[in-house]
UniProtKB/Swiss-Prot annotation:
Residues 254-393 form the Flavodoxin-like domain. It comes from Escherichia coli O139:H28 (strain E24377A / ETEC). Pathway: Nitrogen metabolism; nitric oxide reduction. It is found in: Cytoplasm. This is Anaerobic nitric oxide reductase flavorubredoxin. The gene is norV. In the N-terminal section; belongs to the zinc metallo-hydrolase group 3 family. The lineage of its organism: Bacteria, Pseudomonadati, Pseudomonadota, Gammaproteobacteria, Enterobacterales.
Length: 479
């Protein structure tokens, strides 16, 4: 089913509600995607892009219902990747002599995928035009490395529609086509996720290319992307966001992600986060276990952050494989204007944190001090982690911090209530984790200064997840 975009422009693409992996398994398309193809009917009929190769037959069949294929005068391929030009072989089998307009680099890519050098290719460059009748022209603009060497955009005069290729798009599937018809929170989350995970490496190219396009002084009433929505309501809002994201973007946010073998590094991550939050309550802190989290969500949060703390256990004197892989991805994404710190636990050898620090520095992060803990961190070690978080908060602050009352509160509480008054520390008989009444367990909303007798009955050991009944009074404090 086609959808009218504007006047004689129709969307003839394909929705893909089921797709969950893109670029192999490197990008999780949790909200599906769409492959946008557009049919322009003027004195000349133009097809802009096709769809993913897995929908080739369906696409050609649906296109037949819209137009006699022999009446298609021109095909424009803005991008040769298989989710854009995948149906070309099926289509060209029906209309083999139809001219294809694309960049020189696209010919190489198309032949590499489809192996038909005999097709009627026509190379276009920035500023080239194609008259399609009724006083309208297509204007071509090369956009190399946004995000492939062959990429270009196509502008339709008269209707003032920019067919923007991958730029300004998102992997987002909805029965509605236009930006003002869909859930705005979902839409902009997917826009940022798309930019962070796909276009970040090319941020240095985004601003000059947008400036070049704006320099044509052409009105833009709509931006028709290759994936996701068509921007018809205030279409330049997404252009403004791209300019913002391309300018070494950061928010007052810190991302912590880690992998752990025995939960020791998780304990460190939680304590570091506590230290950050108590020192700078304005900063957003997000924690991810890479083994249980969506990798692309982690990378989107890194993109948004002013700094990242990466934690790993030591295994065979190196970092955990999932951490190594994610750091390699961050290296390729070439994040800018961000700080980093490595941390982790180890047993007899602690080489992973040092290797991790080196890798983060190689990835372009400005490094802060790292932190190591041997074996399972005890209360003293966890306090060092909290202090590390406090120091990170101070070093990475974007504005003067509010005066902390933490130390004052602790001192006042200590003078009024001694540790002895709070009762003994309790130890889990299964995993040996120790509950200290003076420190409580903030992750379960048990405030510092809560004696064991007042800890809720639904309390679970943070390490082994067993209940209060497995706890015993710490042997060293038993009377």
């Amino acid at each position: 089913m086609s959808i009218v975009v504007k006047n004689n422009i129709h969307w003839v693409g394909q929705r893909d509600w089921e797709v969950r992996d893109f670029h192999g398994t490197e990008y999780k398309t949790l909200r599906g995607s769409s492959y946008n193809s557009y049919l322009i009917r003027e004195e000349k009929n133009v097809l802009i892009d096709t769809v993913d190769h897995k929908f080739s037959r369906e696409f050609v069949q649906n296109l037949r219902n819209e137009i006699d294929l022999a009446d298609i005068d021109y095909i424009v391929i803005n991008h040769a990747e298989e989710d854009h030009a995948g149906a070309l072989t099926e289509l060209m089998a029906q209309i083999p002599d139809t001219p294809i307009y694309c960049t020189a680099n696209a010919i190489d890519s198309i032949n590499g995928h489809h192996h038909h050098p005999e097709w009627n290719f026509n190379v276009v460059k920035t500023g080239d035009t194609l008259d399609i009748g009724n006083g309208k022209q297509l204007i071509f603009v090369e956009t190399p490395m946004l995000h492939w060497p062959d990429s270009m955009m196509t502008y339709l005069t008269g209707d003032a529609v920019l067919f923007s290729n991958d730029a300004f798009g998102q992997h987002y599937c909805d029965e509605h086509l236009f930006n003002d018809e869909v859930d705005q929170t979902e839409l902009f989350e997917q826009c940022q996720r798309y930019y962070a995970n796909i276009l970040t490496p090319f941020s240095r190219l985004v601003t000059p290319k947008i400036t070049e396009i704006l320099g044509f002084n052409l009105p833009v009433d709509m931006i028709a992307t290759s994936h996701g929505v068509v921007w018809r309501d205030n279409p330049t809002q997404i252009v403004e966001l791209y300019l913002k994201w391309a300018a070494d973007y950061q928010e007052d946010r810190i991302t912590i992600f880690y992998d752990t073998m025995s939960n020791n590094t998780r304990m460190m991550a939680d304590a570091i986060a506590q230290g950050i939050a108590e020192t700078d309550p304005r900063v957003a802190v997000k924690i991810f276990n890479v083994a249980r989290s969506d990798k692309n969500e982690i990378l989107t949060n890194v993109f948004r952050s002013k700094g990242v703390l990466v934690g790993t256990s030591t295994m065979n004197n190196v970092m955990m494989p999932k951490i190594a892989g994610l750091v390699e991805e961050m290296t390729g994404l070439r994040f800018r204007n961000k700080r980093a710190s490595a941390f982790g636990s180890h047993g007899w050898s602690g080489g992973a944190v040092d290797r991790l620090s080196t890798r983060l520095q190689d990835a372009g992060f400005e490094m802060s001090l790292s932190l190591k803990a041997k074996w399972r961190p005890d209360q003293d070690a966890l306090e060092l982690c909290r202090e590390h978080g406090r120091e990170i908060a101070r070093q990475w602050a974007l504005a003067p911090l509010p005066q902390s009352t933490v130390n004052t509160v602790v001192k006042e509480e200590t003078s009024a209530t001694t540790t002895a008054d709070l009762g003994p520390r309790m130890q889990c008989s299964v995993c040996q984790w120790i509950y200290d009444p003076a420190k409580g367990e903030p992750m379960q909303d048990v405030a510092p200064g809560t004696p064991w007798s007042e800890v809720p009955d639904n309390f679970l050991c943070p390490e082994c997840s067993l209940g209060k009944d497995v706890f015993e009074e710490l042997a060293s404090e038993a009377k």
